[in-house]
Every structure is written in structure tokens, then in C-alpha cells.
Amino acid sequence: MKAFTQHIGLVAPLDRANVDTDQIIPKQFLKSIKRTGFGPNLFDEWRYLDVGQPYQDNSKRPLNQDFVLNHARYQGASVLLARENFGCGSSREHAPWALDEYGFRSVIAPSFADIFFNNSFKNGLLPIILDAAEVDELFKQVEATPGYQLTIDLEAQAVTRPDGKVLKFEIDAFRKHCLLNGLDDIGLTLQDSDAIKAFEGKHRASQPWLFRDA
């Protein structure tokens, strides 16, 4: 998993509340258990004018020019600004996978659905909760300022606006540690690989009848 320490990124404003996981990555694209291949279909029903299908050539599909991610000024955005209850709906890790592959490192919103919130941390995507008034002000500034960037410092738990104002956010200490060090569930387990191997050795020696090759 990619570590997250500090990030400076262009902000794209998605001014919609209650964005659910089927809108983030529609159900027809969930057949793969690989973490790659979902970025081109992020927000598929909003980005394109036709109905998307798995494995099709997205470069030939008609774009919805009214959708924010298709605007030239937001190309290359790596911070998504959203409204309340982002990521609601069914549980699917494909949602943070799609956001990550598109290029987003963080999503900022007044609130998130619990399952999406948890899945994001496990996949290197930083969800940041700010007060609704702070999010409202960010929307105004982003829309009024082409090239609007935010600086996100995870160690300091701070989002810094271009005008220098610092917005503080809360994060669980364990999740913070994992993101700072790029540790997903597998990475955390591998940190104890020596202890696991030692236990397996003792277990095999004390109960050899459980193992066919003993």
C-alpha cells in the first residue's frame, strides 16, 4: 500500500450529497477481484453518455461534458471535495480502488458512510472529515479559483488552503500509523512474520500428527 505523509494536490469539487458506491463504481464492473482496471469507470454513469460495459474501450465513449471530472480545469485532480454521506450504499472495496486508480489520494467531506470510510484507510485513500461550514467555503474557493490546490499533512492532521488558513482534522492513531507507513492488513501481518514462523515451528514440533509431512 502507498504511504501517505504529505500531499499537495489539485482539488475537484463533486457537489452532490449521498454519493453511493454504485455511483462511484457501478455494479457491472465488479467482476474482477484485482485492484486495477477500475479508474476509467469511476463515476461511469456520470462521466459518459452511454451505458458502460466491462472491458470496453473507454477512449471511444461519448463524454458527458457537464460532469466535473471532464472539465479541463480539473484534469489531474488528486483531492476530491464532496458533500455529506459520501460512499453510502453497498460495501465494495472497488470504490476506493477506483478512486485511487483514477489518481485521488484523499476525499474531503462533512461525513462518510462507515464501511466506505473503513475501506478507504485499508487501501491507502485518506478520507478527511471537516465541518460542513469549512467544506462549504472550500467549494466556493475551488469553483472561484482555477488551479486550486490544497496541502494535506497527515502527521500534522492539517489541510492548508492557498490563503494559508489551516483546517485541522481528526484521525484514529492506529489508522494514521498505518497510512504514514503504508501498511495494509497484509503488511501489518508481515511485520510479525518471525513470531508467526516461530509459533508454527513449535506447533509442528509439539503436535506432529497434525501435519502429513511430519
Swiss-Prot record:
Record-linked Gene3D superfamilies: Aconitase, domain 4
The Enzyme Commission number assigned here is: 4.2.1.33
Q: Which reaction does it catalyse?
A: (2R,3S)-3-isopropylmalate = (2S)-2-isopropylmalate
**One of the GO BP terms on file:** L-leucine biosynthetic process
Name this polypeptide is given:
3-isopropylmalate dehydratase small subunit
What quaternary arrangement does the UniProt entry report? Heterodimer of LeuC and LeuD.
Q: Name one GO molecular function term.
A: 3-isopropylmalate dehydratase activity
- Looking at the record's lineage, which domain of life comes first? Bacteria
Pfam families named in the record = Aconitase_C (PF00694)
* Gene that encodes the chain: leuD
